[in-house]
Amino acid sequence: MSEFISLYSGSSGNCSVVRTGEKYIIIDMGKGVRTTSAALKELGLNISDCAGILVTHEHSDHVKGLATFLKKNPLPVYGADDTLDFLDANGIVPASCALRTLSGGEEDVGDFGVTMFPTSHDVPCVGYRIHTPDNKTMTIATDLGVL
């Protein structure tokens, strides 16, 4: 059974998980490694089962925890060109982690099918439609300016 779980949300940090069984993906990581790791552990999730991290945009409440988390857990990071360029230029993603640009069509992220779509915000921002291994579809869009 697939689930969408908000680990934390608000102006101090945002992070969510979509999981099917033990397999999962993370969306954004706006708080430190301790907070995120504790939340994942509380859910019984092992980092080895994570397919990667989807990033919606560059604001600190969505990426503040990435650098330290990725140093300990070198996962692939997915997103739009503008956001990945920002993360790379600012040293947020270590060289040991792959940056993978999503094009807008459905692409495989582990066992999940992910489609990126643009959203309205003051910096380039995207949402994600996630097709799970058990044939469910979930959509996440954060920090929406206008619908």
Language model segments and positions:
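Conserved beta-strand hairpin/beta-sheet module of binuclear metal-dependent hydrolase folds
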Residues: 1-43, 126-142
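Short secondary-structure boundary/capping segments
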Residues: 7-8, 17, 44, 67-69, ...
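Active-site metal-binding motif and surrounding structural segment of the metallo-beta-lactamase
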Residues: 33-79
